[in-house]
From Swiss-Prot:
Function recorded in the entry: Involved in teeth and skeletal development. Has an essential role in the biosynthesis and trafficking of glycosaminoglycans and glycoproteins to produce a proper functioning extracellular matrix. Required for extracellular matrix mineralization. Also involved in the regulation of cellular calcium homeostasis. Does not show transport activity towards bile acids or steroid sulfates.
Protein known as: Sodium/bile acid cotransporter 7-B
Molecular function as annotated in GO: symporter activity
Keyword Cell membrane tagged: yes
Protein source organism: Xenopus laevis
Family: Belongs to the bile acid:sodium symporter (BASS) (TC 2.A.28) family.
Cytoplasmic side: 1-9, 59-71, 138, 185-201, 256-270, 320-343
Keywords assigned by UniProt, alphabetized: Cell membrane, Endoplasmic reticulum, Golgi apparatus, Ion transport, Membrane, Sodium, Sodium transport, Symport, Transmembrane, Transmembrane helix, Transport
Amino acid sequence: MGLLERLRKEWFIIGIILVIVAAKLEPTIGEKGGPLKPEITITYIAVSAIFFNSGLSLKTEELTNALMHVKLHLFVQLFTLVFFPTAIWIFLQVLSLTPINEWLLKGLQTVSCMPPPVSSAVILTKAVGGNEAAAIFNSAFGSFLGIVVTPLLLLLFLGSSSSVPFTSIFSQLFMTVVVPLIIGQIVRRYIKDWLERKKPPFGAISSCVLLMIIYTTFCDTFSNPNIDLDTFSLVVIVFIIFFIQLAFMLLTFLFSTSKNSGFTPADTVAIVFCSTHKSLTLGIPMLKIVFAGYEHLSLISVPLLIYHPAQILLGSVLVPTIKSWMLSRRKALKLTRQPKIPL
C-alpha cells in the first residue's frame, strides 16, 4: 500500500491529530463564546445535522426493527445508568485510600452517572458499520432518561440535589434529535431512488461533523483555566479514565459476544459505544445546576471534560480494529450457517 493510499485510508485519524493540535495552538477560536460559537453551531446545528444525516441514510424498516430490539436497549441502559455508576463507586472506595484529590474522585463518580451522548456513539457506530439504528435509539432514549435519572444518581452517590429544568432540556433534545431524524426520514421518501443510485458519503459527512465536535471540545478543554492541576493528579486521572473506558468497552464486548447473548456483530458495535460513552453536552450544564454554589465545581467537572474527548479519541482510533473484527465475525457466522453438502 502506497503512502498516499495509506494517508487517504487513515484520513480521519490524521484529521483528529490535526484538529487537536489546532485547538492547542489557538483554543479561543472554538471555545464557548468564540468566533465559531460552538454553543450554537455544535449544540444545535452539528447535532441536528448528524441526526438529519442519519434520517436520510437509514431505511425506515431498520429504525422500526431497532425500536423492537428491547433486549439490546435494556442491556445498554442498565449498563450505563446502573452498572457503570455502581462499579465506579466500588472502584472509588479503593482510590480514596490514595493521595488523589478527593474532588477529582467525586468528579469520576459524576462521570459515571451521566447519560450517553446524542452524537459520538452514533457516528462511531456508523463509521464501523454497526447497528446505527440501535445506536440512535439508545443515544436519544438514554439522553431523555438521563435528564431524570442522572440527578437521582448524583443524589444517591454524592448527596447532591437541586431542581433541574426538565422542560427546557427535553425540548432541546426533541428539537435537535427527534425532529431532524423525522425530517430526514420524510426527505428520504422523496429522494430514495436518487440516494440508492448516487450513494452519498453519509459516513464521511458524519465523520467531518465529529472532527468539528472534537475540535471545539478540545478548544474548550485547553482554554479552561480550571484544568490547571498539578501534573501528578492530571496524569493519574487521564490514566484512570482511559483504563475505565478500555475496561468497560472490553466488558461490554465480552458480554454481548457471549454464546447465549443473541446479539449480532453489528449489535455489539452499538452496545460497546453506547454503553461506555458519556455526555458532555448534557453533563456540564447538569453539573452546574446540581452543584450550584460548590466552590469545588471546577475540580468536579475536570474528569468529565477529559472523559468526553478521550472517549471520542479512543473510539476513533479503535474504529479500524472493531470494523475488521465485525467483518471477519460476519464472514465466520455466514460460513457456519451455510448448509453442508452431503457426501
